[in-house]
Amino acid sequence: MGDRKAIFITGGGSGIGRAIAHLFGQRGWFVGVGDIDTAGMDQTLSAIGNGYTYAHKFDVRDRAAWDTALEAFATAAGGRIDVVANNAGIPLGGSLSENSTEEIDRCIDINLKGVLYGAQAALPWLEKTAPGSCLLNTASAAGIYGTSGASVYSATKFGVRGATEALDAEWAELGVRVRSLCPGFIDTPLLEHAPNQQSNEAIRDRVRAAGLEITPVEQVAEAAWAAVHGERLHTLVGQTARRLAFGARWMPGRVRRMARATARPLGQ
């Protein structure tokens, strides 16, 4: 087994995954990225430029592809995987009545089932580098309190938080850490997308119109580093996430009233 620690990151072709890859690469780790976007992965890894990198094209919805990807990455990294970052995800906004069955299935399959498949595939590798190895799941502030106009997305992120808590307990005796990141709106290319097939409005425009904070993606990467090396189960990223968590815990009635008063689906 090699001496250099190794991290494999899904959704590594852009956004949060790219930022995490860059930070860990700068700090001497062997970095692997998985994505369906080959060009994006190449751009991510070219910026690291130390030769200790690997890219693997695959779809997180394919359970068998997970095994192939992690086996190939471990081979490239000298036989070890210390961290698997379950980061691949897609947005979905709009009222539930407007979301197509295809949109709902795709969001659940990528955001939740993909995370569970990744956890299942990662465990044998993380056991080998325990204690201290880590499964890092990207959840969301939408998994802290249900987000109006993003019910399906919110449900998937609640699922990711729940899976993180369950696996943290299940794997504790194995020495494998399980952590989640709960960011608010992050400055990534996803904000340029429309929230669903019925809308032409970019998510970024909707966020700005609501007066909400957009957090630099580099802050998420630093939070990922802290989560992997720390004891906090859920790491909140950005003021929106922290305020929502505080309100949901200490002022749930007020948060509920505000959610009702400001309810407007992202796609409208």
Residue ranges of each PLM-predicted region?
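Active-site helix of classical SDR
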Residues: 119, 156
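The beta1-alpha1 cofactor-binding region of Rossmann-like NAD(H)/NADP(H)-dependent oxidoreductases
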Residues: 38-39, 57-68, 101
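Active-site-adjacent segment of SDR/Rossmann-fold oxidoreductases
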Residues: 145, 166-177
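Conserved glycine-rich cofactor-binding loop
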Residues: 13-14
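SDR active-site lid
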Residues: 173-239
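Residue(s) in the substrate-gating loop at a strand-loop-helix junction
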Residues: 140
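Substrate-binding pocket helix/loop in short-chain dehydrogenase/reductase
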Residues: 95-96, 100-108
